Amino acid sequence: MKSIILFVLSLLLILEKQAAVMGQKGGSKGQLSSGSSRFPHRHRSQHYSGQKDKQHTESKGSFSIQHTYHVDANDHDRTRKSQQYYLNAQHKTTKSKQHLRRRQRLLNYKQKGRGRVKPKRHFHLIVIHRKGGQVHHGTQNPSQDQGNSPSGKGIFRQYSNTEERLWFRGLSKEQASASGAQKGRTQGGSQTNYVLQTEELVANKQQNKQQRETQNSHRNKGHYQNVFEVREEHSSKLQTSLHPAHQHRLQHGYKDIFTTQNELLVYNKNQHQTKNLNQDQEHGQKAHKGSYQSSSTEERQPNHEENSVQKGVPKGSISIQTEEKIYGKSQNQVTIPSQDQEHGHKENKISYQSSSAEERRLNSGEKGIQKGVPKGSISIQTEEKIYGKSQNQVTIPSQDQEHGHKENKISYQSSSAEERRLNSGEKGIQKGVPKGSISIQTEEKIYGKSQNQVTIPSQDQEHGHKENKISYQSSSTEERRLNSGEKGIQRGVSKGSISIQTEEKIHGKSQNQVAIPSQDQEHGHKENKISYQSSSAEERQLNSGEKGIQKGVSKGSISIQTEEKIYGKSQNQVTIPSQDQEHGHKENKIAYQSSSTEERQLNYGGKSIQKDVSQSSLSFQTEKLVEGKSQIQTPNPNQGQWSGQNAKGNSGKSADREQDLLSHEQEGRYQQEFSGAHNTVNIEHEVAYDDLLTQQYNEDRNPVST
């Protein structure tokens, strides 16, 4: 094998010298195509200037020939003859046709047995670009067993850049074809006189080449992306060499069309990308985005189409089930972390301690249906619907005792939170009736779509909780940012807990949220933004109108019901925190001691109607008039006992405030109540949908394209 490598090296040196001599002659033969007389000079500039100049010549696109050669010991004589044919331009066309057929037969034979041979084969795909600045991507069978094999590449590095890159083309052909992208070969392929020998074969062999490469692309289409994704993670050099030029065209199915023939070649359609996740239990994983400690988190950013189905619900382990479907596709995710006791957990983005969270960013629709309620574990049920798709999420963290939890963004201590950012509609239907726990049920509908979320954390005792953004101590919160309308229907009946039900409607849509944290004793709680101690809060930022209808009747607790109407829409929110004993509460923004607060930021004026039916609590009814809307405030405070509240910007004894943080209007309501004597809260919610006319009107204004 070593002798073969040295032989190929000497052959390449001879051919390079001959190409340089012919370049000095100036291309006086005259039979070359337009721009090919400058080929040897550009050829030499590509040798010593790296991929930047290669991409530059790609953008120029001054050539119109593509041909594939197989170089080994058996090919020596034919290669030398083809060089002689190039020197004798009159015989070049007829003689090289025969060699082209022989090389194609040899190439097809090598492609059939390629996956079963040792990974030291040297296929060189030489590509010359056609005029017009576009590149045709040649296709060969990817060898999945070769991987990142560095066979022979170090030997050629000892000689020259030219041979190194040419050898690298032969080496990385599998990686390049695995991604469907011949970026490496296209950028560095036109380096030897193999190309010069076939420059006048365009009119005769182009159609056969197109058909041949189309067949290869259809044959290899199933596992381009999969092999490329695996190898991409293990080699930064391959990322730099394979990623730059035309990866986006491959992922989105762009079309490369040859104009030298009457028959057009449409290439690279319907590329599929498949990602499979291993079902493992991971501990102590340090990453920039997600941290796993006997838990599971998944953040998915699909580009076009993904289908992954995994099943596994073990006891005391992590199970991830994922099926993503965009544009009529479906996705399921089940996350079940085990029952552990964790201390001192710190990460950058999302931290799990016997809890579960999911942050999803989607470009287009996903659909997922999941069912999983284990004992003493966390189950995430997700159904997202965009453009007629649906998603459900159920989060049930286990019952643990956790201490010293610190993170930057979202912290869970036997609780659950979800931050969702969606571009278009979602649909989800969830039902959760826990005992002594937290239940968040949410249904979002955008352009006639809906979503439900159920979050049920357990009852824990937590101490020393500190974070930057959102802190949970046996409580629940949800921060939602949506671009367009939401619709939700929720029902939640819990015992001795907090229930928040919210229905937001934008452009005739509605949403409901139910948050039911448990009854705990918490000490020393400090954070930067929002702090919960056996309470519940919700911060919502919406672009346009909201509609919500809520009903809440609680005993010995605080009930806030809010209806905001923007552009003829309304919203109701009910917040009922539980009765706890809390000490030493300090935060920067909002402090709760057995109380509830809602901060709303809206772009336009709103209408708010609140109704309270509770014992020993505060009731406020507010109606503001902004831009043709009215507002009425009716304070109806009750007698309460307050002690030990220290908050920056908020402190009161039987008092309430309102903060306006809006461009036009923002309503914040504070209701405070002493620690009551009842532990049972029964809530039944009935939510009415909007009428069909509004939905059809909005769908007519916003047509859905599948």
UniProtKB/Swiss-Prot annotation:
Signal sequence range: 1-23
Q: Where is this region: Disordered?
A: 25-62, 131-156, 276-678
Spans of biased composition, class Basic and acidic residues?
Answer: 50-59, 297-308, 340-349, 400-409, 460-469, 520-529, 580-589, 654-670
Localization terms from the record: Secreted
| InterPro entries per UniProt | Semenogelin
Q: Does the keyword Cell inner membrane apply?
A: no
Record keywords: Repeat, Secreted, Signal
The Polar residues compositionally biased stretches are 137-151, 329-339, 389-399, 449-459, 509-519, 569-579, 611-622, 630-653
Give the superkingdom in one word: Eukaryota
This protein's GO CC annotations: extracellular region
Using the UniProt record, give the first listed, main subcellular location: secreted
Biological process terms from the Gene Ontology for this record are: coagulation; negative regulation of flagellated sperm motility; sperm capacitation
| Task performed by this protein | Participates in the formation of a gel matrix (sperm coagulum) entrapping the accessory gland secretions and ejaculated spermatozoa.
Question: Per the similarity annotation, which family is this?
Answer: Belongs to the semenogelin family.
Q: How does it associate, per the subunit comment? A: Interacts with SERPINA5.
Q: What is this protein called?
A: Semenogelin-2
The beginning of the lineage is: Eukaryota, Metazoa, Chordata, Craniata, Vertebrata
Q: Which gene encodes it?
A: SEMG2
